[in-house]
């Protein structure tokens, strides 16, 4: 009798294989889109989900010979990138004495840490204090909810804790902030003309940014504003920009709701629609009773502590709906929250590793790249960009984690790794996603959206984005240049879209992606890392030295491979019915 060959495979080998596959599945799930935000789940609308699935290639390419070659490229190139990044700025680099003074004592293997970035240093140094505040806030909420049945009106707790937090954070400067809050509230509530009220809201909001920039230290003739306690964070105006977004959201949501009610012919008690089981999009225009748009809820929303410092940005309607009507089921799924916590810790440790082994921020601050090879200079810049991404991602995820633990689910801000981008247009959808959603709702769509005025509307959007970030001419120019860079991508996409079913289309897109990535890297390296001096040196070395030309060719090939992997990641998501358009 012939025994089938598979009977000869030991049972323990099969079991070991299944365990390994189970671990791999868990790791892939941990880093999936769905782990980040339930908003990124496949659509509950069956027709919409099937429409997305039909757009994807039904056959996966992950096991093809082509992609096995790509895996080999990854195994070679990625370690070399880390090696070059370390060599470009560590203690063995000849330029080390130029930036050694910017380094601090670290905690990993007795190494120094590059804590020279001012923004992240503030967060990193105050991280234990923030964790303590989270424990106090979440713990106090749960204790009080057990003692006093406030679960139906969470805003009571938010109002009291928010005021106390604000005084502790900004001290007497709370008075300056309060003036802005009150003026905005009066504009929204007491100017009855819908369009006029919206225009004045926008004019006052943008004017307040300029006023704070030019006269931020005003005292209103009150001596205690200059001599009194100014809190843990004396620069109250630094966080005002996020508060302004919430101020505009309240006025817009209130005026929109009032307008709808005025146009209705139903009795008042019948004019409120259903408030049951609204999804994230429906919550943006939730049919709240007009009485909910009051000064108490306004202050509770603006001072909601987990999201006050830097967001993510939640609209007024969404906040009130989740607070007083129906909490999102995601805030009760503690397994998902634990997965989110693990992913946060992974990102935190990743940044700590980079800061301990690659002193690229300090090197770029002192322009210490003399003698480095083109590959090393480019990795110095690339890891700088990764640090910028991580230093924003980590606070945003901590604040969102805090909010989830507290029972409110705001949108996830960063849904793609910075290195997982090949399109400038898609990049802006994935970067600071809650801000992008806010802009679409309150600026882009009211101005007409993506119709015949798409370019003009985009100019308006990026002008506001630039002013909101900081009032500098170079940022305004940056905003306009972004729109200029988007035009070729939009045009080429429209021209070649009809060929998407051709065998060569994916490879042509790969070439376009390489050009796009180079353009985005150059623009961001100039603006945030190397400056014009470093960029000119890199470009000179790329095109006028043998090592540079060789690196340009090899790196472009590696970027092409990376782009193909990015394409297939998105195809895999679409096969599950997920299309986040970035």
Curated annotation (Swiss-Prot):
Originating species: Candida tropicalis
Protein location: Cell membrane; Endoplasmic reticulum membrane; Mitochondrion membrane
One of the record's GO molecular function terms: O-acyltransferase activity
Name the UniProt record assigns to this protein: Membrane-bound O-acyltransferase GUP1
Function description: Membrane-bound O-acyltransferase involved in the remodeling of glycosylphosphatidylinositol (GPI) anchors. Acts only on GPI-anchored proteins, but not on free GPI lipids. Also involved in lipid metabolism, having profound effects on sphingolipid-sterol-ordered domains integrity and assembly. Involved in cell integrity and apoptosis.
Highest taxon in the source lineage: Eukaryota
Chain ranges passing through the membrane: 62-82, 122-144, 159-179, 196-216, 295-315, 344-364, 374-394, 455-475, 476-496, 508-528, 549-569
Family annotation (Pfam families): MBOAT
One BP term from GO: GPI anchor biosynthetic process
């Amino acid at each position: 009798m012939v025994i089938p060959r598979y009977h000869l495979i030991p049972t323990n080998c099969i079991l070991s294989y299944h365990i390994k596959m189970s671990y791999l599945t868990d790791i892939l799930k941990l880093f999936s889109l769905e782990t980040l935000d339930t908003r990124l789940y496949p659509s509950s609308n069956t027709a919409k989900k099937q429409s997305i699935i039909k757009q994807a290639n039904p056959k996966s390419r992950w096991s093809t010979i082509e992609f096995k070659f790509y895996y080999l490229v990854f195994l070679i190139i990625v370690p070399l990138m880390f090696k070059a990044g370390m060599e470009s700025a560590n203690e063995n680099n000849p330029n080390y004495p130029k930036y050694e003074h910017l380094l601090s004592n670290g905690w990993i293997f007795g190494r120094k840490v590059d804590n020279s970035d001012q923004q992240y240093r503030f967060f990193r140094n105050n991280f234990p204090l923030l964790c303590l505040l989270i424990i106090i806030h979440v713990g106090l909420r749960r204790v009080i909810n057990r003692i006093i049945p406030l679960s139906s009106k969470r805003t009571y707790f938010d109002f009291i804790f928010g005021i106390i937090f604000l005084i502790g954070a900004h001290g007497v400067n709370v008075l300056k902030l309060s003036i802005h809050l009150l003026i905005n509230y009066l504009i929204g509530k007491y100017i009855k003309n819908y369009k006029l009220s919206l225009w004045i809201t926008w004019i006052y909001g943008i004017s307040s940014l300029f006023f704070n920039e030019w006269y931020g230290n005003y005292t209103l003739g009150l001596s205690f504003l200059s001599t009194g306690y100014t809190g843990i964070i004396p620069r109250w105006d630094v966080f005002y920009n996020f508060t302004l977004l919430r101020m505009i959201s309240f006025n817009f949501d209130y005026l929109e709701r009032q307008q709808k009610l005025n146009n209705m012919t139903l009795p008042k008690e019948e004019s409120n629609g259903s408030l049951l089981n609204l999804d994230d999009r429906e919550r943006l225009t939730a049919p709240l009773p007009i009485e909910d748009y009051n000064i108490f809820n306004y202050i509770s929303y603006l001072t909601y502590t987990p999201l006050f410092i830097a967001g993510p940005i939640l609209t007024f309607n969404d906040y009130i709906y989740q607070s007083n009507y129906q909490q999102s089921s995601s805030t009760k799924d503690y397994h998902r929250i634990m997965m989110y916590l693990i992913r946060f810790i992974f990102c935190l440790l990743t940044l700590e590793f980079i800061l301990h082994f690659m002193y690229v921020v300090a090197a770029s601050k002192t322009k210490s790249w003399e003698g480095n090879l083109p590959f090393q200079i480019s990795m110095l810049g690339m890891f700088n960009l990764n640090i910028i991404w991580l230093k924003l991602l980590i606070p945003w995820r901590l604040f969102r984690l805090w909010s989830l633990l507290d029972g409110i689910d705001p949108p996830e801000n960063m849904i793609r790794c910075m290195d997982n981008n090949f399109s400038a247009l898609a990049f802006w959808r994935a970067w600071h996603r809650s801000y992008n959603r806010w802009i679409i709702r309150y600026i882009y769509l009211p101005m007409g959206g993506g119709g015949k005025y798409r370019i003009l509307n985009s100019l308006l959007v990026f002008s506001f984005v630039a002013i909101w970030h900081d009032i500098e001419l170079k940022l305004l120019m940056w905003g306009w240049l972004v729109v200029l860079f988007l035009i070729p991508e939009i045009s080429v996409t429209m021209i070649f879209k009809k060929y998407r079913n051709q065998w060569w289309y994916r490879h042509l897109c790969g070439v376009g992606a390489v050009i796009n990535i180079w353009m985005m890297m150059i623009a961001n390296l100039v603006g945030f890392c190397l400056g014009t001096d470093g960029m000119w040196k890199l470009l000179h070395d790329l095109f006028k030295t043998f090592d540079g030309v060789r690196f340009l060719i090899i790196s472009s090939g590696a970027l092409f491979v990376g782009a193909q992997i990015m394409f297939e990641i998105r195809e895999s998501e679409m096969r599950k019915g997920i299309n986040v358009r970035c």
